[in-house]
Amino acid sequence: MKMNCTAFWRTIHPDNIKEMEIKMRSVPILIIGGGAAGMMAAASAIEQGGRVMVIEKMAMLGKKILATGNGRCNFTNLKQQPEFYHVTGSDDVWKLLRRFDEKRTISFFKEAGVYPEDKDGYVYPMSMQAVSLRNCLGRKLDKAEIHFEEEVTDIEQKISATGKNTGFIVKTTKDKYLAKKIIVTAGGMAAKCHGSDGKCFRILAKLGHTVVTPVPALTWFKLKEKYTKLWAGVRVKGIIKAYDEDKKLLAHDKGELQLVASGISGIPVFQVSRYISRELEMSKRPYIEVDFLPEFSAEELYEELLRRKRCHPKLETSY
């Protein structure tokens, strides 16, 4: 086999590598993902005089914002305490959140023309439309260069001869960019239809980051029982408890439970779901208990059911 040594040298010679880099677009700050976090990051960088490029693989920015709060977007909460965050290392999370707390969040959007509406601590835009928040952030990105329907496929770290990080080569489905700094706000795996499909984890792991196996952390429960079809549409204030297979209480919460055709949902369910998800990820057999009538004792409930049976003998009281 013959090899053209001249051509080979021309390809790998440092001067040619530099020439290749010159042909790539140079970007001071490249943000991967144009969701809520990406838009906020871009707005903050622009306010400080940064030149920003945002790469978003969907056809619009902030698509997941539009689905938040059933289309109303509760963008912060006035009731915040460290114990509200069901995560490992909640103290560290709390410290980070205090750096840009609910007061600063409300002030940020109010100055941009979005006035808050308080609903029992949940803060919505006064219009009660998520699009108000999305458009507000969009206006702050007027000076950013935004690429739609372009997906990042790889990131390579540029290391100098002295071992110093000099930037990143970002490869996409359409081009290559030489970025001085990158901010990855690509989301997790929560909503593939909105762009969060988890592909970024592979790229981040390649760069040396530790990736904890992702599991659903805010989700509803699909139940195997057939009677759930009969309770679809019912909402009730109750208590839900999550247990491990050894009957140890993992978490509990109370509030409005939303009963759907194939299971159970609602904020209390979301609050305990991460514990069940993590147990299932470890191939264990956790379970839940639901108290639909916490104001009744077992004896009182039994007497109430007997009373109803006497008053309505033809009415079904069980499934």
Task: Please place each PLM-identified region on the residue numbering.
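N-terminal amphipathic/hydrophobic targeting modules at extreme N-termini
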Residues: K2-D15
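N-terminal Rossmann-like FAD-binding beta1-loop-alpha1 element of flavoenzymes
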Residues: V27-V54
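Short hydrophobic core segments
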Residues: L30-I32, I55, V152, Y177-K192, ...
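Glycine-rich FAD pyrophosphate-binding loop
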Residues: I46-N70
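Residue-level recognition of phosphate/Mg2+-coordinating polar/acidic sites
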Residues: E47-Q48, M60, Q81, R98, ...
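N-terminal glycine-rich dinucleotide-binding loop that anchors FAD/FMN and/or NAD(P) in oxidoreductases
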Residues: L66-R99
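Feature captures the FAD/FMN-dependent oxidoreductase FAD-binding
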Residues: R99-K181
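Glycine-rich loop(s) and the adjacent beta-strand/alpha-helix scaffold that form part
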Residues: K181-Y227
